[in-house]
Amino acid sequence: MKITVLLCNMFHVKHCYNKYLVYHNSKWDCKFFLNYKENINNESYIKEHLSSELKIPMDCINLKYVTSKIHEKYSESDKMNKIYSHKFYLADIVDFSEIMKKDVFEIDGRTYYWMSMSELESDQNVLKKNSDIINYVKESF
């Protein structure tokens, strides 16, 4: 089970609403929503990881479980069809750090981007590797 966390960007007029925080995954050479393997204490686990990765206090993070999806998809790395199970959470960050207010920023060597759904959909690499999740987020949010 994979946990997908959607961080909506709601902190500055310049960025407007409806932007999501994605990161560049060097293994896949692609931008993905933040995601974690499922843990028995999902919400605490997610908050701890978000706090650690984004350098923000845990008490500034509010999480809401939204939905789940199970689907079959071809795995490029394993060269076979696999069943994927995703849980989607919406994260609200109460107080953004100054670095997170930039359209593109880096923390601990990982590059993050605030992107709208239309920007994600116009990235052919993202669509090729992650269109199932992009479409599901678009339908669900």
Regions found by a protein language model. Name each.
Residues 1-10:
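Acidic, metal-coordinating catalytic segment for phosphate/diphosphate chemistry
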Residues 13-19, 78-81:
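Short, solvent-exposed loop/turn segments that connect beta-strands within catalytic domains
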Residues 15-56:
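Conserved Nudix-box catalytic region and its N-terminal flanking loop in Nudix hydrolases
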Residues 23, 64-68, 115:
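Conserved beta-strand termini and adjacent loop/short-helix elements that scaffold enzyme active sites
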Residues 28-39, 73-79, 104-107, 140-141:
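Functional cleft and adjacent loop/helix regions within the main domain
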Residues 51-100:
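Active-site segment of metal-dependent pyrophosphate-handling enzymes
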Residues 85-140:
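NUDIX/MutT-family hydrolases
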